[in-house]
Amino acid sequence: AGKDIWCEKPMTRTIGEGKRVVEAVRQNGRIFRLNTWFRFKDTFYGLGTTVEPLKKLIDSGLLGWPLKVTISGATGFTWKFFWIGRDHLDPEPVPAELDYDMWLGPAPWKPYNAHRVHQTFRGYWDYDGGGLTDMGQHYMDPVQYLLGKDDTSPVKIEVDAPEQHYDAVGIWRKIVYTYED
């Protein structure tokens, strides 16, 4: 379409999908922006302070390097119901006011169930990916920015989580990102 893109998170569900987006943007000479709206505020989500003094402190080297940053996604208990899917959902009739095929978009077709579609859609791999892809970036993006890692990626990612269901997202206990430096 020859247009620049302003994309809301999550950009893609897989690294491969993300690489294809980058390739298409480069091939077409377009501008692409993945929105994380806290970048346009004085304070980032969960920091409790303005960004620039903290960025200046880190950039000064006074804290040394490498830094270890620990973030926690401690939120209200009810949010966890939105982030965790259920396996073995029974098919239900599609409500008359819902165009289910339109709602699914490019996601694989699965029988309708209210838990899969409405507020709790975040708990299913086909549509979101749970708390990590829904709210995780709000915690991780400030760290990427503050550490000057916007143009790089971790070289190692370690996950402590129970085995995940192929369809329904489960709990993530701990994720460790290691960068080259």
Tell what function each PLM region has.
Residues 18, 46, 51, 79, ...:
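Active-site-proximal cap/loop segments of hydrolase catalytic domains
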Residues 6-7, 12-13, 31-34, 67-71, ...:
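Structural recognition of the beta-strand scaffold that forms the well-ordered cores
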Residues 1, 17, 50, 96-99, ...:
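Stable alpha-helical elements in mature extracytoplasmic
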Residues 2, 24-31, 60-64, 147-153, ...:
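Secondary-structure transition/capping motifs at alpha-helix termini
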Residues 42-103:
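Rossmann-like NAD(P)H-binding beta-loop-alpha module
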Residues 1-42, 59:
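Beta-strand-loop-alpha-helix segment that lines the small-molecule cofactor/substrate pocket
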Residues 93-94, 101-181:
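Rossmann-like dinucleotide-binding domain that binds NAD(P)(H)
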Residues 37-38, 42-44, 72-80, 157-172:
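Short, surface-exposed recognition loops and adjoining beta-strand edges that mediate ligand/DNA contacts
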